[in-house]
Curated annotation (Swiss-Prot):
It catalyses: L-citrulline + L-aspartate + ATP = 2-(N(omega)-L-arginino)succinate + AMP + diphosphate + H(+). Pathway: Amino-acid biosynthesis; L-arginine biosynthesis; L-arginine from L-ornithine and carbamoyl phosphate: step 2/3. The keyword ATP-binding applies. InterPro entries: Arginosuc_syn_C, Arginosuc_syn_N, Arginosuc_synth, Arginosuc_synth_CS, Arginosuc_synth_type_1_subfam, AS_cat/multimer_dom_body, Rossmann-like_a/b/a_fold. This is Argininosuccinate synthase. Pfam families: Arginosuc_syn_C (PF20979), Arginosuc_synth (PF00764). Homotetramer.
Amino acid sequence: MNKKVNVNKVVVAYSGGLDTSVIIPWLKENYDCEVIAFVADVGQGAEELEGIEAKAIASGASECYVADLKEEMVSEYIFPTLKTGALYEGKYLLGTSMARPIIAKAQVEVARNVGADALCHGCTGKGNDQIRFEGAFAALAPDLHVIAPWREWDLVSREECLDYLAERNIPCTASLTKIYSRDANAWHISTEGGVLEDTWNEPNEDCWAWTVDPEQAPNESETVSIKVEKGAVVAVDGKAMTPYEVVVYLNEKGIKHGVGRIDIVENRLVGMKSRGCYETPGGTIINEALRAVEQLVLDKASFEFREELGIKASHLVYDGRWFTPLCKSILAATEELAQDVNGDVVIKLYKGQATVTQKRSDNSLYSEEFATFGADEVYDQSHAEGFIRLYSLSSRIRALNSK
């Protein structure tokens, strides 16, 4: 294949999987350049990272850098997004989407440090990730070339990729038996492909990688006590934790009880729809806790505004627009709204459900004295009449004019 640009040194986002194992020798052959592998540890698991540096070198990389991004990802990307209440298309807690900007940012930093003049990713031309990576690259390193092999090469199947490596005597642990495409980090794991490609097929047990089947979960419920300060979880079950520690702890609880499963068909940015089974056990529990405290402390107008910001934020994050003025502004607005989101929540975990059973806050606007259905001495119900007449005045005038 002809070179599109002259490249001397490229940093490739490397996962150790089949695609990126092929990309390293392919880059050397087609761009005649030095290839440096960059691995982002975002909590995908020790098994995924074991021996990954040696694997990258064996594939032809001159160096391999591994960056531990777990704590930063949760504290600087996931927790701020949670404050917006973002749920893409009403269900998805954006597990893959939120990991991409920090990976791209760290990849750019490595490129700067080693003097690279190009960046490379292994995203396909059908998905959202190519846009997320390249959108971040454009915002952070517009001077660097971007190489997207899946949009250039003529390899079209796993079999061809395996043959490519075998012809070059490059070791690879991948096989043809892989049916599902999975992406995991500390926050979630996604499963796509296989039986899920037909929306009339019910997900089978292979579609769920982490969580216990809710029907097989313990028959005894379990409660967790969560402390929230300024819209972020700071302690669980009486123990102070970092954001990443919170996620790890609540993942363990949620996995055990089958919490956090969704099976959705979503609108990709590239125009097509895709189906996936997503598991976000700890994140589901955290989200329930934050929304419960918001119910107590946000007034009607603030709550409505936060909901609007959450919808917009979900699309910005999903669409790879993290490094934009609008996303920065929304995060700043929800950070301000979160200043009073302080409180304690108790959540019961039982067979796939995370149910808030108790909540309290020193900033609560809820008043039992005002809200009671019994007798009270603080609320004069006759005052409502004047308010209703003014509130409905425009409707009254419109009706009178139509006669």
